[in-house]
Design a protein with these regions (language model features):
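Extracytoplasmic beta-rich repeat domains
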Residues: 1, 28-51, 76-94, 111, ...
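Short coil/turn segments that connect the beta-strands within blades of beta-propeller domains
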Residues: 4-6, 54-55, 99-101, 166-168, ...
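Blade-level signature of beta-propeller repeat domains, shared across WD40, Kelch, NHL, RCC1
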Residues: 430-476
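Beta-propeller blade signature
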Residues: 69-74, 115-127, 188-204, 249-257, ...
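Residue-level signature of beta-propeller blades and closely related beta-rich strand-turn architectures
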Residues: 13, 63, 108, 176, ...
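Loop/turn-rich, solvent-exposed surfaces of beta-rich toroidal or solenoidal domains
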Residues: 229, 325-326, 357-415
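Short, conserved, GDST-rich strand-edge loop motifs in beta-rich repeat architectures
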Residues: 104-116, 172-190, 326-358, 446-464
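Residue position within the beta-strands of beta-propeller blades
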Residues: 9, 59, 102-105, 172, ...
């Protein structure tokens, strides 16, 4: 987060304010949490960033607290508890400020929790509203859950939503249902694997779209919702774009949730396509066999065609730029038994991956046509990139490698223009800003995250853990 010449950086253990021109630390505030907290966090002891509003910095903590700090001094101004870690909840999400409300999501779907989005008063920390992402039987959508399965239904909200101030609408992606074993929870399982359009003042839902009903493959839909104006069938249209974890690239009319396009952008075998009238996937025998308890090889894997790392859209080229994954996974259900604060997935986690033949590229930085899903160019990587992507008005695309290279590509051709070795894996989101007539680009470097935890990629064994901020000046 960069604001008025100051870079605000968060980790799981601290918040820092750094002078953007000199790199001098202005203040640092430590984050304390109970020692047992990391055991409850699914997929990385991390924090995804901060928000700023009226002189306050807002962030979340691993033990599911929302805090406000004085932007000038780092002094804690208020702290509110969103959920109980003993029940399996945690927080890594960056808050979003929309229409004078601080919005936060929650993690914990792998622990048998029930997801939600909260609204908070930025001045006092007062809790204003909560929108449950898994409805109870007396709420709209409650009939898509059988019995009491909704109580453990998942639907985490661990990636920040997008705000359209013109329509005063927040678009927030919802995670996978719990457990993975879909036989435990018959029905469509709303509003998991969906995008919700919300009024930020009240949390009231304007519309929803579900990408993957009754999903068994951990294809959560939390990844960024990119808002843009583009021409669709000859008409100017306000769209929402999502490179979904299920392998399909979706374009929706963001004013009403109507599906405009849905095409595969990576290899997909769990569905043969998307029904454009209903928006529902046309499932293959792979999905049917998985629900029946048979072991299958599924594409994409449970890490998806793209995971959390944000893509970027360039209105000049009309292309979306995304770090994608090109490997599949082995999937087989197991019985799911719930115990508070412990994993509740119902899946064999001992043999997860179906790697490309001959140890080929496991991921690609792709330039994708949003309306067709077709790739204009790609930059393969033996080890998949897990950083966010930044595209600039100058026609440059920035991304990073898990082995430490920070890279720049030509947005139109994909030609690599430059790279710099940062010394550790890059998994953060690059950011750019202009200050005193100079354009800067910054990125954090520090190896970790879901791929390092679960992939078992020995090629990363010698990558140092890192933990640094790099700032570069862009020269003509």
């Amino acid at each position: 987060l960069v604001y008025q010449g100051i870079i605000y950086v968060t980790t799981h253990a601290a918040t820092m304010a750094i002078d953007a021109k000199t790199g001098k630390q202005i203040w640092k505030t430590k984050v304390e949490y109970p020692a047992e907290t990391p055991r409850i966090v699914c997929c990385g002891i991390i924090n995804r960033g901060a928000a700023i509003h009226e002189g306050k910095i807002f962030r979340t903590t691993l033990d599911a607290n929302v805090i406000a700090l004085d932007a000038k001094t780092g002094k804690e101004l208020w702290r509110e508890k969103a959920a109980d870690i003993k029940e399996g909840y945690s927080m890594t999400v960056a808050p979003l400020v929309a229409d004078g409300v601080v919005l936060t999501g929650i993690s914990g779907a792998e622990f048998g929790t029930r997801g939600f989005i909260d609204g908070w008063d930025p001045a006092t920390g007062k809790h204003l509203w909560r929108t449950n992402t898994v409805p109870s039987p007396d709420e709209p959508g409650g009939d898509t859950w059988k019995g009491d399965t909704w109580k453990l239904g998942g639907g985490s909200t661990w990636i920040t939503g997008s705000f359209d101030p013109e329509s005063n609408t927040v678009y927030w992606g919802i995670g996978n249902p719990g457990p993975f074993n879909a036989a435990v929870r018959p029905g469509d399982n709303l509003y998991t694997c969906s995008v919700l359009a919300l009024d930020p003042k009240t949390g009231k839902m304007k519309w929803h779209f579900q990408f993957s009903p009754n999903n068994p493959f951990d294809y959560d839909a939390v990844a960024e919702m990119v808002l843009a104006d583009m021409t669709v069938e000859g008409k100017p249209t306000k769209v929402l774009m999502n490179a979904n974890r299920n392998g399909y690239f979706y374009v929706l009319d963001r004013t009403n949730g109507k599906l405009l396009a849905a095409n595969p952008y990576v290899k997909v075998n769990w569905a043969s396509g998307i029904d454009m009238k209903t928006g529902r996937p046309i499932e293959t025998d792979v999905t049917k066999d998985a629900r029946e308890g048979k072991k299958v090889v599924v594409y994409p894997s449970i890490l998806g065609g793209k995971n959390w790392e944000p893509m970027s859209f360039d209105p000049q080229t009309g292309l979306a730029y995304a770090n994608t994954l090109s490997f599949g996974g082995h999937y087989k259900t197991e019985p799911a038994t719930y115990k508070a604060g412990e994993w509740y997935v119902g899946m064999d986690l001992t043999d997860l991956w179906d790697w490309p033949a001959d140890n080929g590229p496991r991921g690609d930085l792709k330039a994708i046509d949003p309306l067709t899903g077709k790739t204009k160019w790609e930059a393969p990587s033996d080890i998949p990139r897990f950083s966010g992507v930044l595209s600039t008005a100058g026609g440059v695309v920035f991304s990073g490698q898990l082995t430490g290279e920070f890279e720049a590509f030509d947005a139109d051709s994909g030609k690599k223009l430059w790279q710099f070795q940062t010394g550790s894996g890059i998994e953060g989101q690059p950011v750019t800003w202009q200050q005193d007539g100079v354009q800067y680009v910054a990125v954090t470097s520090g190896y970790g995250g879901v791929y390092s935890l679960f992939a078992g990629d020995e090629r990363l064994a010698k990558v140092p853990p890192g933990g640094s901020l790099w700032v570069f000046a862009v020269k003509n």
